[in-house]
Amino acid sequence: MTVNTKTYSERAETHASPVAQRLFRLMESKKTNLCASIDVDTTKEFLELIDKLGPYVCLIKTHIDIINDFSYESTIEPLLGLSRKHQFMIFEDRKFADIGNTVKKQYIGGVYKISSWADITNAHGVTGNGVVEGLKQGAKETTTNQEPRGLLMLAELSSVGSLAYGEYSQKTVEIAKSDKEFVVGFIAQRDMGGQEEGFDWLIMTPGVGLDDKGDGLGQQYRTVDEVVSTGTDIIIVGRGLFGKGRDPDIEGKRYRDAGWNAYLKKTGQL
């Protein structure tokens, strides 16, 4: 049996990462593989949208540095409260891309203190294996076994003209192999392999839409069925959930159901 056709529960039983285990179990219990990307610039709108979308998602993806009125007390503490209320995990889309010592400091310190609240973050492979080791050290120094952290590598992007493909993507996969427990998977457009070597990588895919094919700014959208059939585990949706004229409650249900049905089809449960 390939990873592609195993259920989330089955994958949770054998996965090397506590973060991935928790996420798979959460997805199965909530019956959702939807990640909501909340890119807004005020704390009020950020928290209001998350409260509306929380029941439908397994993961909330943040770009915390675009919030103009950010503070740990008024932004992060309520975010953590909502994650407990609605039972979702948090993914800070930081895209680290520097030497190990620098990314460690960026991860644990500064204004945002990402390691203290984000279950998952991500990194480019351009600087080599050191980015993984630096972030892992930061996680170890600032968290406990009760709050494990995980890393996604950026193997492929959904934007027009992206340089993240081909040899770059393959080298990024090799970097991911350096740490089976901390690196939980990839931001990618398809399955990235690894099963024959004992890896079970989570694939999270942005650029998923049920209606639009692009946004005029380089984003390309693929359908839910299309991405899940080629290996996606979690669909990442942003403006499709709350853009102009869209009701987050209606769209949250719509994307949750579309993603879950695609998963059931892929695993032979539907």
Curated annotation (Swiss-Prot):
CDD domains hit by this protein: OMP_decarboxylase_like
Entry-linked PROSITE patterns: OMPDECASE (PS00156)
Active site: 95
Pfam families in alphabetical order: OMPdecase
Keyword Translocase appears in the UniProt entry: no
GO cellular component: cytosol; fungal biofilm matrix
Keyword entries, A-Z: Decarboxylase, Lyase, Pyrimidine biosynthesis
Superkingdom in the source lineage: Eukaryota
Stretches assigned to coiled coil: none
Residue numbers binding substrate: 39, 61-63, 93-102, 221, 239
Enzyme Commission code: 4.1.1.23
Enzyme class per UniProt: lyase
Pathway the protein acts in: Pyrimidine metabolism; UMP biosynthesis via de novo pathway; UMP from orotate: step 2/2
Gene Ontology MF annotations: orotidine-5'-phosphate decarboxylase activity
Catalytic activity, reaction form: orotidine 5'-phosphate + H(+) = UMP + CO2
GO annotation, biological process: 'de novo' pyrimidine nucleobase biosynthetic process; 'de novo' UMP biosynthetic process; adhesion of symbiont to host; cell migration; filamentous growth; filamentous growth of a population of unicellular organisms; fungal-type cell wall organization; pyrimidine nucleobase biosynthetic process
Family: Belongs to the OMP decarboxylase family.
PANTHER family named in the record: OROTIDINE 5'-PHOSPHATE DECARBOXYLASE
The protein's name in its UniProt record: Orotidine 5'-phosphate decarboxylase
